[in-house]
Amino acid sequence: SPEASEDEIQAAFRPNTKALFGETIANPSIEVLDIEKFARIAHRNGVPLIVDNTFATPVLCRPIEFGADIVVHSTTKYMDGHALQMGGVIVDGGTFDWTNGKFPEFTEPDDSYHGTIYTQAFGKAAYIVKARTQIMRDMGACQTPFGAFLINQGLEPLPLRIERHSQNADAVAHWLEKHDKIESVSYPTLEGNPYKERAAKYLPNGCSGVISFSLKGGREAGARFIDSLKMASLLV
C-alpha cells in the first residue's frame, strides 16, 4: 500500500527481494505514490525502485526525477489513445548500481551473448541493454512495426489529450461528490482527499482521467448503473 510506513515496508523485505514496485496513481483506488519515500527505502536495501507510470504518463509525472530507477508504461492506455494496439515501455534511468552483489546476471558472463558482462560492457546502460538483447530475445516481447507506428501517432497529441482528460475527470469528480446517490469519490484534486497534497507535488499539472467512486445501494445499484451507461463501455 502507498500508505505503508517505512517500518512496514522494511519488514516486508527478504534476502531474495530484488526490487520495490509501485504505481504513480494506483488502479483502481487512485492512491498517489510517495515516490521519494519508496526510492529511499529501495536504495537503502540495495534494490531498484520500479514505478508503473501508466495512468500519469510522462506528461504529468516523471518518476525518475524523484528517485525511481526504472519506469514502465502500458502503451495500450493513454499513450495509444485509440485502443488500437497492445504494448509496453521500459524506461531505464541508468541510476542504479547493478554491481552491488545482488544481481550476478549483470556482473557475470552471459554465455548466450559471447560471454558479455553487461556492467563492464555497457556501464549505466547495463539493465536496458540486457532487457533488449537477452530478455526480449528469450521472451519474445517485441512490438510489431505497425503497432509502433500507432503508438507514435498517439504520442503526438498526448500532452493535449492528457490535459483534457485531467480537466474532465476533475469536473466529473466534483460533480459526483455532490450527487445524492454517490457514497464516496476518490480523486486527488477533491478537498479532503488524503492524496491532495501529495498530488500537488508529484502531479502538479493534473491527475489523469481515472476516477474511483462508490454508489449507495451496493452491488445491485452498481449493476443497474453499469447496464444504464450509454456513452461508456464496460471493459475488463
Short names for language-model regions:
Residues 162, 181-236:
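Conserved C-terminal alpha-helix-loop-beta "cap" of PLP-dependent enzymes
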Residues 1-178:
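Conserved PLP-enzyme active-site core in the AAT-like
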